[in-house]
Amino acid sequence: MSNSSHTLSPRPRYQTIRELGRNRAGGRITYLAKDNVTEQSVILKRFLFAQVGSEWSGFKAYEREIQVLRGLDHPGIPRYLDSFETQAGFCMVQEHKDALPLSAPRSFDPDEIQKIAASVLEILVYLQNRIPSVIHRDIKPENILVDEQLNVYLVDFGLARIGSGEMAMSSVAAGTFGFMAPEQIYNRQLNEATDLYGLGATLICLLTGTNSTAIDTLFDEDGRLNFNPLLPKLSLRFVDWLSKMVEPKAKDRFPDATAALEALKPIYVNRLPEVKFSQLALEFKTTQLGEKLTGLKQISSPNKTQSSFIG
């Protein structure tokens, strides 16, 4: 990535600081930039597309995304700030959040991952409750930002679908393989359960330590994400919740983000202590991450017990 600083023409208000990433197929480059008027850091997305006659190819589709972002007002979605044409295409400016994508090398414990999941679901609830509703269509680790305080932000609405089916932006791909729900891959009708699949796949990557580019290694021959054996220390209820999030058939997932969130809230992520009963003793074993503790309570008579703990 380039670290050189230069000013974009014809709008000198924004000065690029460094390149953050690019999508060659889509002709998009993302920069961290500076607003020379407000002195604030911003995110500047630069789109390049061919000029056909007097019409910009894809301009109306890009304009549609701007309309979507302008209407969104949620603390978990960076605000749209500005947009303008350039000689080679088009630029869009958004609020900058000092947060890293989940694809960046970091580690979270299961409780933190549950909190991240709940935060993303709250954003999806907001999008799904809008009229018309918004389906993001590209939920993956790269598009979920998390800061040091575990504040969560959902970015990149370039593939968003609004209402009955109009896509916010023309694109070569309709998502990211491994995180796309099967109905996206096969161009079937999308609904509120579609984004749940991408979130579930993202959480599985975090919990299993799988890089997003290697998620294909988790699929079995039937096209299902096979992750259960990799999470022996997580509660069965949480594993079942994850499994429901990534069911291949949309009808077998939670119907929407609201239902998924309500099902997640009461779940204890780590596996609860195992209790074994016998005629003379009760044995307690914890299986939480990083801890192994065995407690043995001897029963010597109905009115007298002896206890010992081994850690």
Language-model region placement:
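Conserved catalytic-loop aspartate of Hanks-type protein kinases
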Residues: 195
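Conserved activation segment of eukaryotic-like protein kinases, specifically the C-terminal portion
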Residues: 169-183
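Catalytic-loop of the protein kinase fold
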Residues: 128-146
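Activation-segment/catalytic-loop signature of the eukaryotic protein kinase fold
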Residues: 83
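Activation segment signature within eukaryotic-like protein kinase domains
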Residues: 116-117
